[in-house]
């Protein structure tokens, strides 16, 4: 079994990761860590997240400097479900040994260090680790992931958006001079577990935020290879992302070309499902899937694509497991999709 630990295990994403690794046929969940200052330190994970009660009885161990320096050679896999700054500070130590590090923060997703000052609010000083890091969009960068020591797991909005747009861009269907327009709504769990007025039950209302300045915009643009207009919204539901994307296509594009682009991109990727109707969040919440559907207006030359994911799974934890599967030579869906043969 492959020895695995999770740092930042008390949050929503960390708990989902623990659940997935606990049930995985090849990875073994050896330890769960939280900040030494965490109010959940020394509690059992199942006591913090009731749906795991009686399933995962591991304690949430306070992370000390001694433990931090030992993990790189004690573990085979380290998942970081930590704030950006913590991942940034700890990465050189955690990646210094045999362990492969899968970082679910945004600290190593982009190569331009200035982006972190502009969008994340901190100066990036880990140039060597940043150079090493590979972007973990599992259904697109599998070959890079297979040999990487540091994998930067994509953000939730970029996962939903890129899954819809990359087939079109790679097939050359998007018209030059026109920016794809992404409108996406996320559940409140995307804001994390920490209490805040803006995500409290009585305060949440459907609202745009981070308009023309959200940190996921440069991430989407960088890995799509073209600029986009991205507007995120906070919805009054727990989890899931629904992105509706409008794209101007080239004059000669027909429905067959669009269908071929998506089929070619995802024919061997069972995590991504091309639907025959508009996706809804109920179809993907609690699953590792990304559901896609589209409609083309040939007269106006516009294509509308909808992408639906669970922000905590395909947008975070299950995609991290996909990346770990690929890194250790397994099918990306191992432990995530249970195929039943008749």
UniProtKB/Swiss-Prot annotation:
InterPro entries (alphabetical): AGPR_AS, AGPR_type-1, NAD(P)-bd_dom_sf, NAGSA_dehydrogenase, Semialdehyde_DH_NAD-bd
Reaction(s) catalysed (UniProt annotation): N-acetyl-L-glutamate 5-semialdehyde + phosphate + NADP(+) = N-acetyl-L-glutamyl 5-phosphate + NADPH + H(+)
Record flagged with keyword Manganese: no
Keyword Transmembrane helix: no
Spans traversing the lipid bilayer: none
NCBIfam families: argC (TIGR01850)
Protein name: N-acetyl-gamma-glutamyl-phosphate reductase
Gene designation: argC
């Amino acid at each position: 079994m492959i020895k695995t630990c999770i740092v930042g295990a008390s949050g929503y994403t960390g708990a989902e990761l623990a659940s997935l690794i606990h049930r995985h046929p090849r990875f073994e969940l050896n330890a769960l860590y939280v900040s030494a200052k965490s109010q959940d330190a020394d509690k059992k994970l199942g006591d913090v997240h009731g749906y795991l009660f009686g399933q995962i009885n591991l304690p949430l161990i306070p992370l000390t400097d001694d433990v931090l320096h030992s993990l790189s050679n004690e573990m085979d896999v380290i998942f970081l479900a930590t704030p950006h700054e913590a991942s940034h500070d700890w990465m050189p130590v955690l990646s210094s040994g045999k362990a492969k590090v899968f970082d679910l923060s945004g600290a190593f997703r982009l190569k331009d260090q200035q982006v972190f000052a502009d969008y994340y609010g901190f100066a990036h000083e880990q140039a060597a680790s940043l150079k090493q890091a590979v972007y973990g969009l599992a259904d697109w960068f599998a070959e890079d992931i297979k040999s990487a020591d540091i994998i930067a797991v994509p953000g939730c909005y970029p996962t939903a958006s890129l899954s819809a747009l990359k087939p079109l861009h790679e097939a050359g269907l998007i018209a030059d001079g026109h920016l794809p327009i992404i409108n996406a709504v996320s559940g409140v769990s995307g804001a994390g577990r920490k209490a805040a007025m803006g995500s409290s039950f009585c305060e949440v209302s459907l609202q745009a935020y981070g308009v023309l300045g959200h940190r996921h915009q440069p991430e989407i643009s960088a890995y799509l290879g073209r600029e986009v207009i991205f507007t995120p919204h906070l919805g009054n539901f727990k989890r899931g992302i629904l992105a509706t994307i409008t794209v101007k296509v080239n004059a000669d594009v027909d429905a067959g070309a669009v269908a071929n682009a998506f089929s070619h991109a995802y024919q061997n990727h069972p995590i991504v499902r091309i639907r025959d109707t508009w996706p809804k969040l109920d179809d993907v919440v609690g699953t590792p899937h990304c559901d896609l559907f589209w409609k083309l207006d040939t007269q106006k030359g516009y294509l509308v694509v909808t992408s639906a994911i669970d922000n905590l799974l395909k947008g975070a934890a299950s995609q991290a497991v996909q990346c770990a599967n690929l890194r250790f030579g397994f099918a990306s869906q191992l432990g995530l999709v249970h195929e039943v043969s008749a």
